[in-house]
Structures are given as structure tokens and as C-alpha cells.
């Protein structure tokens, strides 16, 4: 850059970005990056898995089986985005992106086993750094006193940062194959 331009930028503490890319391509890349980094963000408890290209956020009370369901999905060839805590960012009016805090990226915690490094155990193709939130599956203990939609006629939604995401409540009973249920829902 011009030496005077550089001097004034330093003098006024203005960041100066340089790249060998064409200015239009570089500007577009910076705008995309800023759009994600400055987007409204919340933390959500659950597991985010990419199932057949759809971002499935599995939620429910602690100990209900979210991580176990995710592990079975990974074993079936799907991809882990994040376990336990998701950082959800609203990057556009209709798009939510989920990612893991750096400290938990690519790890799953299994009660009684400990922490598993999914990337090391299953390979690089078993993980993703970010993923869209397309569907929420809420796991809950089955209750004989509650009526459950057996035909899928009732539409449920969950609201995150003003975005309505399709949702399914799945009652948990011994012997249910949660991975298969998640695949079917996706």
C-alpha cells in the first residue's frame, strides 16, 4: 500500500487488510466472515448432527440419551457438528448456523465412558465445524399420561432467535432405536 495511507491507518488505529486476491473476491469473503462472527448468538444444550445433509439438533434433559443417539448416527456415517453446547448464530433471516466452542469441538461425552474424540476414532469425514439447524428433535421420557401424535399430523416448531424450526417430540422407552428415528425424521 501507499506509505502515506499505511502511516495514517496506523496513526488512527484503523485496521488495514491486504490480500493477493481480487478485491471483489476478498471483500465478499470478509463480508461473509463478519456476517457470521457478528451475527446474534445464543447457546443451546443438545447435540447437532448432520443427517443426510440436514442439520438435526437433538435436545432433551441431561442423561436422556442425546449423545448416545449421536454416536450411533456417526457410526451410520452421519457427521457430528457439536455435542453438549451449541452456539447458534442467526446469519440471515431464515438461516441458523450451529457450531461448537473450540474446547469441545469434535468431542462427545458419554456417561460412564468419558470423553470421546470423534475425529480420531471415526475419521475426519465424521465431523463438521458448522451446520445449519433444519430440524429439532426433542427427546423426553415416555409418560403414559401424555397423548403423543402418532400420525405426524400436528406440526411443532421451536423458536431460536426469531427463526421457527420444525420440531418433533420423541418419547423415550427402552429398546427404541433413536438413530433410526432421527434418520427417518430428517
Where are these regions (language model features)?
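P-loop NTPase nucleotide-binding/switch module
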Residues: 33-53
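Feature captures the catalytic cores and cofactor-binding loops of soluble hydro-lyases/lyases
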Residues: 1-36
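Glycine-rich phosphate-binding P-loop
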Residues: 53-81
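Short acidic-glycine loop/turn motifs at beta-strand connectors
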Residues: 52, 90-93, 140, 161
Amino acid at each position: 500500500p501507499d506509505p502515506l495511507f499505511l502511516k495514517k491507518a496506523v496513526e488512527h488505529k484503523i485496521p488495514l487488510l491486504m490480500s493477493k486476491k481480487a478485491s471483489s473476491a476478498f471483500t465478499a469473503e470478509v463480508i461473509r466472515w463478519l456476517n457470521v462472527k457478528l451475527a446474534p448468538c445464543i447457546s443451546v444444550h443438545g447435540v447437532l448432527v448432520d443427517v443426510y445433509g440436514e442439520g438435526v439438533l437433538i435436545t432433551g434433559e441431561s442423561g436422556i440419551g442425546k449423545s448416545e443417539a449421536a454416536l450411533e448416527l456417526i457410526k451410520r456415517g452421519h457427521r457430528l457438528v457439536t455435542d453438549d453446547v451449541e452456539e447458534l448464530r442467526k446469519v440471515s433471516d431464515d438461516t441458523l448456523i450451529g457450531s461448537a466452542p473450540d474446547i469441545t469441538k469434535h468431542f462427545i461425552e458419554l456417561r460412564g465412558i468419558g470423553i470421546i474424540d470423534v475425529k480420531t476414532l471415526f475419521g475426519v469425514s465424521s465431523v463438521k465445524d458448522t451446520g445449519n439447524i433444519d430440524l429439532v428433535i426433542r427427546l423426553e421420557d415416555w409418560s403414559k399420561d401424555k397423548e403423543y401424535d402418532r400420525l405426524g399430523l400436528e406440526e411443532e416448531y421451536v423458536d431460536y432467535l426469531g427463526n421457527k424450526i420444525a420440531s418433533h417430540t420423541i418419547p423415550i422407552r427402552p429398546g427404541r432405536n433413536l438413530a433410526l428415528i432421527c434418520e427417518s425424521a430428517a
